[in-house]
Amino acid sequence: METTSFGFAASLLFVGVPTIFLIGLFVSTSDGEKSSFYSDTSKGRLSPEPKK
């Protein structure tokens, strides 16, 4: 089956753009895998006041 260069470019962009976007989001987070959902010390806490 023959493919055109347009099809190859479209497939590459279809995979590459979301991958680069997600890697950029991961790198831009300061905590890495830790998020505010699991940690009360991060911004965006689930409760308005921290537990004492």
Swiss-Prot record:
Record has Metal-binding as a keyword:
no
In terms of NCBIfam families, this protein maps to: PRK14094.1, PS_II_psbM
* One GO term of the biological process aspect: photosynthesis, light reaction
User: Has the keyword Iron-sulfur been applied to this entry?
Assistant: no
Q: What does this protein do?
A: One of the components of the core complex of photosystem II (PSII). PSII is a light-driven water:plastoquinone oxidoreductase that uses light energy to abstract electrons from H(2)O, generating O(2) and a proton gradient subsequently used for ATP formation. It consists of a core antenna complex that captures photons, and an electron transfer chain that converts photonic excitation into a charge separation. This subunit is found at the monomer-monomer interface.
**Annotated stretches, region: Disordered:** 31-52
What single Pfam family name could you report for this chain, choosing any that match? PsbM
Transmembrane segment boundaries: 6-26
Entry keyword set: Membrane, Photosynthesis, Photosystem II, Reaction center, Thylakoid, Transmembrane, Transmembrane helix
User: Biased composition, Basic and acidic residues: where in the chain?
Assistant: 42-52
Assembly with partners or alone: PSII is composed of 1 copy each of membrane proteins PsbA, PsbB, PsbC, PsbD, PsbE, PsbF, PsbH, PsbI, PsbJ, PsbK, PsbL, PsbM, PsbT, PsbX, PsbY, Psb30/Ycf12, peripheral proteins PsbO, CyanoQ (PsbQ), PsbU, PsbV and a large number of cofactors. It forms dimeric complexes.
InterPro entries according to UniProt: PSII_PsbM (IPR007826), PSII_PsbM_sf (IPR037269)
Q: What is this protein called?
A: Photosystem II reaction center protein M
> Per the record, GO CC terms?
photosystem II; plasma membrane-derived thylakoid membrane
Topological relation to the membrane, as annotated: Single-pass membrane protein
Locations listed in the record: Cellular thylakoid membrane
What family does this chain come from, according to its entry? Belongs to the PsbM family.
**Encoding gene per record:** psbM
